[in-house]
């Protein structure tokens, strides 16, 4: 199938204050998915979607995988993806978003290096599974959704407990990925580079270092990265830096110079220029914008055209 998307969109989501997850539930999410949307997107949070009914395809990186009722997908923060209903039909999906880094970091009985490796494994790829082939994980996901929907006493404690079991199941998927996942050669090949950016975005990053992290040549790395991520490596680095800047602007009292430095920009002018280039708004305007605080779903668009300079 010919590649149909030449743009990728970054969607910044925020978990409501005091909640464990962001849950998007109910009949508002019955729709024709993918209608009028011609690009992939990725998130700052782990996304889990459960399809109650409907048919179509999920795009995970370069893979087009059919879905039907009782399919569910697990998408790590940096994987470009989208959901498309069959033309002229609607589907009923419900969604939960999890700050996996925060949740795993609060697990007390593991060494920090072990926790870091757990996150790395869980974030390595995405999955589209069915309730039939993985009933345990399907039940856990539906359990989180029902707790979020009903909000009975102690529901947050219940969700935290279920999430702990989900992390175990995610790790088991990673252990057994050859059996349960479709092949995603390009995104798997560049996983080392994605990890490198996650840990070093605040530093100067050379493309040669990313290629080295994947054990391939720089020219081969550039080609594989663009095929897998629909953008150039430098675009991805900037998106991750801006994602971090959004987090700092939203959740800390750091000034703009501190945010720029902590996010990997060499100067405040470079930070302002790149922030406005991809968000079409200045960092100061973004921080003060009321729309960033009022919506249940904090939704910001960062579009990186392939070949964007």
Give the positions of each predicted feature.
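Basic/polar phosphate-binding segments, predominantly the helix-turn-helix DNA-binding elements
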Residues: 169-174, 196-242, 254, 258-289
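A hydrophobic/aromatic-rich effector-binding and dimerization subdomain
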Residues: 2-30, 80-149, 168-176
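Structural motif
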Residues: 72, 91-93, 200
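Amphipathic alpha-helical recognition patches that constitute DNA-binding helices
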Residues: 47, 154, 158, 232, ...
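Hydrophobic/aromatic-rich alpha-helical bundle segments in the mid-to-C-terminal region
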Residues: 152-155, 177-182
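A short, Lys/Arg-enriched amphipathic alpha-helix from helix-turn-helix/homeodomain DNA-binding modules
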Residues: 134-138, 160-163, 179-205, 209-214, ...
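Hydrophobic alpha-helical core bundles mediating ligand binding, dimerization, or RNAP-core interactions
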Residues: 58, 93, 137, 141-145, ...
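Generic protein-terminus/edge-of-domain signal
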Residues: 1-72, 79, 87, 112-114, ...
């Amino acid at each position: 199938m010919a590649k149909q998307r030449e743009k990728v969109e970054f969607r910044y989501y925020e978990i409501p204050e005091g909640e464990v997850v962001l849950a998007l539930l109910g009949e508002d999410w019955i729709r024709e998915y993918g209608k009028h949307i011609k690009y992939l997107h990725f998130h700052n949070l782990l996304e889990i979607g459960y399809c109650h009914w409907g048919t179509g395809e999920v795009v995970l990186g370069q893979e087009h995988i059919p879905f039907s009722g009782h399919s569910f997908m697990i998408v790590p923060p940096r994987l470009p993806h989208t959901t498309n209903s069959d033309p002229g039909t609607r589907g009923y999906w419900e969604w939960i978003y999890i700050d996996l880094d925060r949740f795993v970091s609060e697990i007390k009985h593991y060494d920090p290096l072990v926790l870091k490796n757990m996150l790395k494994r869980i974030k390595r790829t995405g999955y589209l599974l069915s309730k039939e082939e993985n009933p345990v994980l399907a039940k856990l996901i539906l359990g989180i959704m029902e707790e979020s929907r009903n909000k009975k006493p102690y529901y947050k404690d219940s969700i935290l407990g279920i999430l702990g079991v989900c992390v175990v199941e995610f790790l088991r998927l990673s252990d057994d990925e050859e059996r349960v996942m479709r092949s995603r050669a390009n995104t798997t090949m560049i996983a080392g580079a994605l990890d490198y950016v996650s840990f070093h975005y605040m530093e100067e990053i050379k493309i040669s270092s990313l290629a080295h992290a994947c054990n391939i040549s720089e020219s081969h790395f550039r080609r594989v990265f663009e095929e897998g991520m629909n953008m150039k490596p430098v675009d991805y680095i900037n998106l991750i830096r801006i994602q971090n800047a959004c987090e700092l602007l939203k959740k800390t009292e750091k000034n703009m110079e501190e945010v720029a430095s902590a996010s990997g920009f060499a100067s405040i002018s470079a930070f302002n220029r790149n922030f406005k280039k991809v968000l079409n708004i200045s960092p100061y305007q973004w921080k003060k914008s009321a729309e960033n605080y009022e919506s249940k779903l904090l939704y910001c668009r960062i579009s990186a055209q392939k070949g964007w300079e």
